[in-house]
């Protein structure tokens, strides 16, 4: 008890001192207890004792600390338990592995800790182990615990519990330990798994080996049976003396090869038995000397044939041994035959038999066989005895064999307990040494299993007695020997077959099926030999048979002897190393061919070169050179490349066959083969050879003839080359001519257009003066506007010049077609609009000839109409096609004729509608462009086309009447151009006529390709001002804002959206939008708007409301044309006439936006306003009426449902945000292109302020329809229907030209007022009737002259620079541009002068530059290049727009112009109105600004001037559509958001 308490106190002390409360060293603890027992009380201790005690305690404390450090650093698990199993302490690695804290587990049972929580079984095992350890038992076992990753992973430990005893031998503490053996355990498991796999694989291999052995045994047995049936009958026939000698030779070959095959089968069977461990030995007493002599005697003849020195050395006395005679005979025979095989002629072979003691107590013998052959390399001495191993295993080895002979020798010798070795002789050759015991060793385990004789001990005793007797006989020198007795178990006869072996021993027989027996010695050795020859012939014959077969294999066979080829048979070369196979093949083929033989590849090549055979039959594996090597070498020689080769191979390898065929082998035959197969293949190859040879001879003969032809062709080729050279010169000349022609056309265009420019320009200028009532030059030479003769003359000049310009354009188009340079620029096309515009362009000419034009072009149904209005094509070229066809119909139709136009969509082209001659014979309606088509047909009842001329109607320059008396002019290129345009659209044109004076019909067929966008054309910006037949662009309005439904009402259009509130300070906005299309005989439009308000701001559309102190803004929205036979428009206007009224008539378009850009082939911008054509469904003839009050647009512009009833439309129209303007070419005589709607408003004391007009009026009406008697209730009654009214209206319609046009970007006139066209006001007195009746009834595509009244101030405030080398051109341009309102024009005839002016900062800089391209010294390109370079260098300079003036119209030239830096391209002759609009557009584009304050001031002045002109008491309607009303108002309107610059008036 004292010890325990002491131990506890010591433990507590250690806890306090060590901070860990653990006891680490049991030894130090016990020493401390023992030390404390011997201590005195402290008061009895001396100073030295106290110091000693303190030092001792310090040492113990340090020891405990060191122990703690060592335990915590240990990798293994260590703890300390009391005898009850409670945990006292544990090292740090154990705590970390279990994820526990020391303080939480101290004092608890050890098995309740986290480590053992893997399973309840584990906890129970630990509890049981602790219980056993507390009784003093050491416990150790492997277990799994939670010991890794803070107690989350299991590990395997080698766990032990060691009890610790006190001095009394009692267990005081328990020490648990654990070593992590997880990896070791995993390794053991992996090793166990691998071992199991290896065990399984071994068993599998063992099983496969057994199966293989069994297979060899079965195959050997199966082979031996047919071989026995071959050998037996063959031997029987050979014994027959009546057999023919040739047959006997064949039978001998069969017997010989059968025995050889039997030997191979026996060897394979022996190998299988050896592998299976089932090879048994049949021991018998054998006289070794006699056996060796018998075997050697078989080789004596062979030795003489090969001139070999063959010697046999044996002991003089008999040497008896207990061996397996059969196997030993095979061993000796194999060694001797190998020596003969590898020893060359003249060499030596020696066989020595002698006694050799294997050990002092073990007598034996050795047989040494040596030769003088090549020997065996030292590195092969060990492996030469392996199975299938050969010194030379290649396909070119000289000696054959399977490689089993030496392997079987070693196996048989080893079974006898002997050894076989090999070494090379210093003089050359190899030496094999066999060493075997005379008697078998029964103590060895090997022979217990393999020896079959159970009485071998008796044989040993007999052999000993025999040796003793022989020694005695030698001493006595007796001549006769006593024969020993036979002692055999279970044998009664003297010579009996030993049946003591197993059943498998039957397979150990030799090739002849004989067994050797052990004889009991009763006589002398000589008697044994004689009796063996007499009584046991089987054994002796067996030895002789084995040796004789080996000799036969080595004996050279008889070769085939070739005879003389007296019959000139085809030669066959047979290359085969086996003499018998060589001879067999040669004799087989000699019946048909002359055969020559060779025995290896080298000899085969030599004989091939000597005789050049017709066919080669060769083996694959031969000595010196294999068959495939021989083939490869022959094929590399062109001389023998055509010789067919038949290859014989014993390898059934598919890859080898493919390789041989690739290397040039003609055919191959697998061994074994039948004679019929071999002959058939040889005959086939020989037949093919003969056929090939015959064809080659024929070819050679033909080559002779061909050579003559070649010579002739060579001469002709030489002549052709000469002609080709001349043609090349002609071609170059033609190319130069074409180039010169193109240059000529360009120069011609320039030279012709330059004078035309002057003619047309001055015509425009003079007509401008006539319209304005002024003069061209001022002074006395004034031209009166009333002089109709002068006007007629000028218009005639203008018309003729325009016709000349169109002729130039047609010729240039034809030049492009001929040069294959004609192309299209595709975009969205609205076909009905194109047709309507074309009809409008020919309307005057049709009326002059009283021709009625009917059309049906809108399509049936909404879907078809949508398709027709959105197809893909070249708009400009399609317009040209329509205009050409329509103008031809007008030309060739007599007066009062009829023309009908029809447009529709079809799924299939009906043959009844598409008649006549097709312009494209290859045209096919079933193609990849789609299954829907557009048919456009123009039918007339005119002159017609003669039947004989119909096929030539589309030929260029062809005309039906080419005589000098023809009635119709033209060049005959219009229809040719038409067909080329349609062909480029993948369509066709059909021309049909029943004959002369029976009318004609032209049908255009186009595939439908729907459009995807509104602008698919080239982005180039080019302006074309040239005149040509009408090119119709898209309508002015791309979409309507309001869709108007026409209902059946009483023909009243009440468009009053007015809130009339009779209160002060009210705003009454009356917005009346006239967008009505009336197709009725009579329409009464009554518009009554009476608004009387004080201090009100009334915005009334089409209403003149004059109130006291009112500001009336009358916003006119006029977008309409009426095509009615009789239209009665009653407009009741209630005018309150007061002084000082300020009427602002602002004409607005409503919520319509024009945002489309129409791109044509040459991308010219058409900024000219155009009035849509009349409705296509009406008859455009003499019944064409116009009323100026209500102008109704074409259905193409506004999709209105026409129910042939009156319209009741209530529409609220807003302000326009964008309008796109277009520039195109205007035919002159048909048109009076007024760009403003002039309505005569005659009011008394009214100020008409028409400023800030944010609109573009789409109708140009140049006639004031008689509106007399305008009272307060003004009634614009129905206008009579004189043709002059219609003609005057049509004359005001500006028509575009079909010439290609470049398109400008979208222009917004309300974003910048420079794009807004100005209108002029005609202020007249009461009851004035102003009718400008310009009746031009002839069709002529002329450029129209600008009208003075409407365009006087069109270019107000613009400064222009003009560069042209011709003085008359600069004079013309400056004169006309000044009249159009230009502020300043600086003209230069050289680029250098113009550029110097631009660089002078003191000079006024132009707003725009007009430059000719063709000028001396420096051209227009130099001008634009200098200008753009200057702008790039000095970015502060504003960019100045520049327009190119050129007479060239080719696409390449136009593209070059735009790429060079020009902004637009204007072709000569110039339409000055369009040029002016282009100038305004470009200035707007470059953000040119004008002082808006000045504009407002000038507008106020203009209003005052207008008030002074209206001093009558009558009610007149003055609707002025001009931005600037006054004489000198040249300012330009801008939006309020832009900066302003003041523009001085000219």
UniProtKB/Swiss-Prot annotation:
UniProt modified residues of type Phosphohistidine: 221, 750
Description of its domains: Atypical domain architecture: contains 2 histidine kinase/receiver domain modules.
PANTHER family: HYBRID SIGNAL TRANSDUCTION HISTIDINE KINASE D, TWO-COMPONENT HISTIDINE KINASE
Keyword Phosphoprotein in annotation: yes
Coiled coil: 36-63
The keyword Kinase appears for this protein: yes
GO molecular function annotations of the record: ATP binding; phosphorelay sensor kinase activity
Reactions that this protein is recorded to catalyse: ATP + protein L-histidine = ADP + protein N-phospho-L-histidine
Protein name: Hybrid signal transduction histidine kinase D
Record-annotated Response regulatory domain positions: 571-686, 1359-1483
Function: Acts as a receptor histidine kinase for a signal transduction pathway. This protein undergoes an ATP-dependent autophosphorylation at a conserved histidine residue in the kinase core, and a phosphoryl group is then transferred to a conserved aspartate residue in the receiver domain.
A biological-process GO annotation: sorocarp spore cell differentiation
Domain PAS per the UniProt entry, residue ranges: 65-131
Bias kind Low complexity: ranges: 1013-1031, 1042-1146, 1313-1346, 1501-1526
Family annotation (Pfam families): HATPase_c, HisKA, Response_reg
Keywords in alphabetical order: ATP-binding, Coiled coil, Kinase, Nucleotide-binding, Phosphoprotein, Repeat, Transducer, Transferase, Two-component regulatory system
Modified residues (4-aspartylphosphate): 619, 1412
Gene name of the encoded protein: dhkD
EC number, UniProt record: 2.7.13.3
Lineage: Eukaryota, Amoebozoa, Evosea, Eumycetozoa, Dictyostelia
Residue intervals of the Histidine kinase domain: 218-440, 747-1010
Disordered as annotated region, ranges: 1013-1148, 1266-1285, 1313-1350, 1500-1546
Organism per entry: Dictyostelium discoideum
Start and end residues of each PAC domain: 139-193
């Amino acid at each position: 008890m004292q010890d325990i308490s002491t131990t506890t106190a010591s433990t507590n002390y250690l806890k306090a001192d060590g901070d860990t409360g653990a006891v680490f060293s049991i030894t130090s603890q016990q020493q401390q207890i023992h030390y404390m027992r011997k201590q005195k009380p402290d008061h009895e201790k001396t100073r030295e004792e106290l110091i000693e005690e303190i030092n001792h305690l310090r040492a113990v404390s340090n020891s405990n600390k060191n122990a703690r450090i060592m335990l915590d650093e240990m990798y293994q698990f260590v703890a300390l338990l009391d005898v009850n199993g409670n945990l006292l302490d544990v090292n740090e690695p154990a705590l970390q592995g279990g994820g526990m804290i020391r303080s939480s587990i101290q004092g608890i049972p050890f098995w309740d800790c986290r480590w053992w929580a893997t399973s309840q079984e584990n906890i129970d095992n630990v509890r049981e182990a602790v219980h056993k350890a507390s009784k003093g038992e050491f416990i150790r076992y492997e277990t799994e615990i939670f010991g890794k990753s803070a107690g989350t992973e299991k590990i395997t430990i080698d766990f032990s519990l060691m009890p610790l005893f006190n001095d009394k031998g009692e267990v005081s503490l328990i020490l648990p330990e654990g070593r992590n053996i997880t990896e070791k355990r995993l390794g053991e498991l992996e090793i166990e798994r691998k071992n199991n796999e290896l065990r399984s694989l071994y068993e599998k291999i063992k099983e496969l080996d057994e199966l293989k052995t069994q297979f060899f045994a079965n195959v050997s047995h199966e082979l031996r049976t047919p071989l026995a049936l071959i050998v037996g009958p063959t031997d029987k026939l050979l014994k027959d003396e009546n057999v023919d000698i040739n047959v006997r030779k064949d039978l001998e070959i069969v017997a010989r090869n059968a025995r050889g095959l039997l030997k191979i089968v026996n060897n394979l069977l022996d190998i299988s038995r050896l592998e299976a461990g089932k090879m048994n030995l049949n021991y018998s007493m054998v006289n070794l000397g006699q056996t060796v002599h018998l075997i050697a005697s078989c080789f004596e003849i062979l030795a003489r044939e090969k001139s070999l020195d063959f010697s046999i050395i044996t002991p003089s006395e008999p040497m008896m041994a207990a061996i397996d005679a059969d196997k030993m005979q095979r061993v000796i025979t194999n060694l001797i035959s190998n020596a003969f095989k590898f020893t060359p002629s003249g060499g030596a072979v020696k066989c020595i038999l002698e006694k050799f003691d294997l050990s002092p107590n073990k007598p034996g013998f050795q047989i040494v066989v040596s030769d003088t052959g090549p020997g065996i390399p030292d590195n092969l001495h060990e492996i030469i005895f392996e199975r299938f191993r050969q010194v030379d295993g290649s396909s070119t080895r000289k000696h054959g064999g399977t490689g089993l002979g030496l392997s079987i020798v070693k196996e048989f010798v080893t079974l006898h307990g002997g050894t076989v070795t090999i070494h090379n002789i210093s003089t050359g050759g190899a030496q094999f040494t066999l060493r075997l015991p005379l008697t078998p060793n029964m103590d060895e385990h090997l022979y217990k299993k393999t020896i079959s004789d159970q009485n071998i001990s008796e044989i040993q005793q007999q052999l000993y007695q025999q040796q003793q007797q022989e020694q005695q006989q030698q001493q006595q020198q007796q001549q006769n020997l006593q024969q020993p007795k036979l002692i055999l178990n279970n044998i009664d006869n003297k010579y009996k077959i030993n049946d003591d072996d197993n059943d498998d021993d039957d397979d150990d027989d030799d090739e002849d099926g004989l067994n050797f027996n052990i004889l009991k010695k009763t006589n002398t050795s000589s008697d044994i030999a004689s009796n063996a020859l007499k009584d046991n012939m089987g054994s002796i014959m067996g030895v002789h048979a084995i040796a004789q077969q080996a000799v036969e294999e080595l004996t050279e066979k008889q070769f085939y002897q070739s005879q003389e080829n007296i019959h000139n048979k085809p030669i066959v070369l047979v290359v085969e190393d086996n003499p018998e196979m060589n001879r067999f093949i040669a004799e087989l083929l000699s019946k048909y061919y002359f055969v020559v033989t060779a025995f290896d590849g080298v000899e085969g090549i030599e004989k091939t070169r000597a005789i050049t055979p017709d066919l080669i039959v060769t083996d694959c594996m031969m000595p010196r050179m294999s068959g495939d090597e021989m083939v490869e070498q022959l094929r590399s020689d062109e001389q023998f490349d055509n010789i067919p080769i038949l290859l014989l191979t014993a390898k059934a390898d598919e890859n080898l066959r493919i390789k041989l065929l690739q290397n040039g082998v003609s055919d191959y035959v697998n061994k074994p083969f039948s004679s019929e197969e071999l002959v058939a293949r040889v005959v086939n190859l020989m037949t093919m050879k003969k056929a090939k040879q015959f064809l080659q001879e024929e070819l050679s003969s033909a080559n002779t003839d061909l050579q003559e032809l070649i010579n002739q062709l060579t001469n002709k080729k030489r002549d052709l080359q000469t002609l080709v050279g001349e043609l090349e010169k002609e071609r170059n000349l033609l190319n130069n001519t074409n180039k010169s022609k193109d240059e000529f056309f360009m120069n011609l265009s320039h030279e012709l257009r330059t004078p035309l420019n002057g003619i047309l320009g001055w015509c425009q200028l003079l007509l401008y003066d006539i319209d304005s009532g002024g003069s061209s030059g001022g002074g006395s030479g004034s031209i009166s506007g009333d002089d109709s003769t002068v006007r007629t003359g000028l218009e005639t000049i203008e018309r003729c010049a325009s016709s000349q310009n169109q002729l130039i354009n047609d010729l240039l188009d034809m030049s492009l077609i001929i040069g294959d340079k004609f192309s299209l620029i595709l975009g969205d096309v609205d076909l009905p609009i194109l047709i309507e515009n074309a009809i409008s362009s020919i309307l005057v000419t049709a009326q002059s000839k009283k021709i009625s034009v009917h059309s049906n072009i809108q399509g049936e149904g909404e879907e078809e109409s949508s398709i027709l209005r959105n197809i893909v094509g070249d708009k400009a070229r399609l317009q040209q096609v329509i205009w050409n066809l329509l103008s031809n119909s007008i030309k060739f139709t007599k007066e009062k004729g009829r023309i009908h136009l029809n447009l529709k969509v079809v799924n299939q082209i009906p043959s009844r509608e598409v008649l006549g001659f097709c312009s494209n014979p290859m045209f096919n309606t079933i193609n990849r462009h789609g299954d829907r088509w557009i048919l456009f047909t123009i039918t007339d009842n005119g002159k017609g086309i003669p039947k004989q001329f119909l096929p030539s109607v589309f030929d260029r320059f062809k005309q039906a009447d080419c005589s000098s008396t023809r009635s119709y002019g033209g060049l005959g290129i219009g229809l040719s151009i038409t067909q080329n345009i349609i062909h480029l659209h993948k369509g066709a044109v059909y021309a049909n006529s029943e004959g002369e004076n029976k009318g004609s019909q032209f049908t255009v067929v186009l595939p439908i390709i729907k459009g995807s966008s509104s602008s698919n054309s080239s982005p180039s910006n080019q302006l074309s001002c040239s005149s040509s037949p009408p090119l119709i662009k898209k309508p002015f309005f791309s979409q309507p804002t309001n869709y108007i439904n026409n209902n059946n009402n009483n023909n009243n259009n009440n468009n009053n959206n007015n809130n009339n509130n009779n209160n002060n300070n009210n705003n009454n906005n009356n917005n009346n939008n006239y967008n009505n299309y009336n197709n009725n005989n009579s329409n009464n439009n009554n518009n009554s708007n009476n608004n009387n308000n004080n201090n009100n701001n009334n915005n009334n559309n089409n209403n003149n409301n004059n109130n006291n102190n009112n500001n009336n803004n009358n916003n006119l929205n006029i977008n309409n044309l009426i095509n009615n036979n009789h239209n009665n428009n009653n407009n009741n206007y209630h005018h309150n006439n007061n002084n000082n009224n300020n009427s602002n008539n602002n004409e607005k378009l409503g919520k319509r936006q024009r945002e489309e850009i129409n791109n044509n082939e040459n991308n010219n911008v058409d900024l000219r306003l155009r009035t849509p054509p009349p409705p296509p469904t009406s008859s455009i003839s003499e019944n064409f009426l116009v009323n100026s009050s209500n102008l109704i647009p074409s259905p193409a512009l506004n999709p209105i449902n026409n129910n042939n009833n009156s319209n009741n439309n209530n529409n609220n129209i807003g302000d326009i945000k964008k309008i796109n303007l277009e520039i195109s070419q205007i035919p002159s005589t048909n048109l009076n292109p007024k760009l403003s709607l002039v309505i005569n408003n005659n009011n008394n004391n009214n100020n008409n302020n028409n400023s800030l007009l944010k609109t573009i009026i789409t109708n140009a009406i140049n006639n004031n329809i008689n509106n007399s008697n305008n009272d307060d209730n003004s009634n614009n009654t129905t206008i009579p229907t004189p043709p002059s009214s219609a003609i005057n209206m049509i004359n005001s319609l500006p028509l575009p030209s079909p010439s290609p046009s470049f398109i400008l970007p979208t222009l917004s006139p309300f974003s910048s007022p420079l794009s807004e066209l100005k209108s002029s006001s005609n202020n007249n007195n009461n009851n004035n009737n102003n009718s400008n009746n310009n009746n031009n009834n002839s069709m002529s595509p002329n450029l129209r002259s600008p009208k003075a009244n409407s365009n006087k101030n069109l270019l107000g405030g613009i400064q222009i620079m003009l560069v042209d080398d011709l003085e008359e051109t600069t004079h013309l341009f400056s004169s006309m541009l000044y009249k159009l309102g230009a502020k300043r024009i600086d003209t230069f005839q050289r680029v250098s002068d113009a550029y110097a002016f631009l660089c002078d900062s003191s000079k006024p800089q132009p707003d725009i530059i007009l430059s000719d391209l063709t000028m001396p010294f420096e051209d227009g390109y130099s001008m634009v290049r200098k200008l753009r370079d200057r702008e790039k260098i000095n970015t502060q300079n504003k960019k100045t727009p520049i327009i190119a003036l050129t007479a060239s119209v080719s696409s390449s030239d136009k593209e070059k112009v735009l790429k060079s830096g020009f902004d637009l391209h204007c072709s000569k002759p110039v339409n000055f109105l369009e040029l002016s609009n282009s100038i305004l557009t470009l200035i707007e584009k470059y953000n040119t600004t004008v002082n808006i304050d000045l504009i407002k001031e000038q507008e106020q002045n203009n209003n005052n001037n207008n008030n002074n002109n209206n001093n009558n008491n009558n009610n007149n309607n003055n609707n002025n559509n001009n931005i600037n009303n006054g004489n000198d108002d040249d300012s330009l309107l801008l939006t309020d958001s832009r900066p302003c610059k003041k523009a001085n008036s000219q």
